[in-house]
Regions:
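Conserved Radical SAM active-site core
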Residues: 15, 20-24, 39-42, 46, ...
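Flexible, acidic/Gly-rich N-terminal and inter-domain linker regions that tether
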Residues: 1-46, 50-54, 206-224
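Conserved AdoMet/S-adenosylmethionine-binding subsite of the radical SAM
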Residues: 93-229
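Generic structural signal for well-ordered alpha-helical scaffold segments
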Residues: 30, 73-77, 177
């Protein structure tokens, strides 16, 4: 297991006027959520206030390069695809993230935002598909869930539960039913890589007649746990 740097600097990068701290911008197939399989440009912003046990992008906690929005947009345009995913880390931890999201929408891109669920999403442009990661007990960060976010989501958005165990699944199922999420928007259940067998999760969902999607991380099936894919 890697050692996670929990210093404040890696949690939320110090702001610089007009700039965003970027870990990487890359082109790959979307591996998760509604657009899985689509060629997509990923903008991975640096820093995250959470430390989930199953995190597969710890390298985004530190480092990165300060860039202005014009520089980011130029790189995105070079890949010639209409699909863009802004991810992290926790992208909303950076103040200028909203400016980037707005610029992407105004330029005509189809944009998704992958967020931890611990930051307020109410001000995110409604043209963006918000993919909210609700933290299960196995993540070690359940107490950071900002449940009020669910009140502002629409059928255009998605919620995701990453499951580390059967206990996580039972917890997620209880929350889904208690909050009426099945009738509101797409729900994604994803087995934590190497911790829950995908076939087991599939059978649990079938047994319980849940109106959800079982989500496997396509990029990991294709390339393994490799950054930039």
């Amino acid at each position: 297991m890697s050692v996670i740097d929990s210093s404040e600097e890696t949690r939320i990068p110090v702001s610089r006027e007009g700039l965003l701290k970027v870990t990487e911008i890359f082109y790959s197939l979307q591996g998760e959520a509604r657009d899985a399989g689509r060629p997509t440009v990923f903008i991975r912003l640096t820093g995250c206030p959470l430390r989930c046990v199953y995190c597969d992008s710890e390298y985004a906690f530190y480092g990165g390069e300060w860039q202005n929005i014009d520089q980011i947009m130029e790189q995105v345009a070079s890949y010639q695809t209409p699909y863009v995913c802004v991810t992290g880390g926790e992208p909303l931890a950076q103040k200028r993230c909203q400016d980037l999201l707005n610029r992407l929408c105004e330029t005509g891109y189809r944009v998704s935002l992958e967020t931890s669920g611990a930051m307020d999403v109410s001000q995110v442009d409604e043209r963006i598909s918000r993919v909210l990661d609700i933290k299960t007990p196995g993540s070690g960060e359940t107490g950071r869930n900002l449940w009020s976010n669910l009140d502002v989501l629409s059928e255009h958005d998605q919620v995701k539960f990453v499951l580390c165990s059967r206990a996580d699944y039972d917890w997620a199922m209880a929350e889904i039913r208690k909050r009426g999420l099945e009738q509101k928007l797409d729900i994604l259940l994803s087995p934590a890589w190497g911790q829950v067998e995908p076939a087991d999760l599939a059978q649990w969902v079938l047994n319980d007649h849940l109106n959800v999607r079982v989500q496997l991380q396509l990029h990991k099936l294709l390339w393994g746990d490799v950054p930039g894919k």
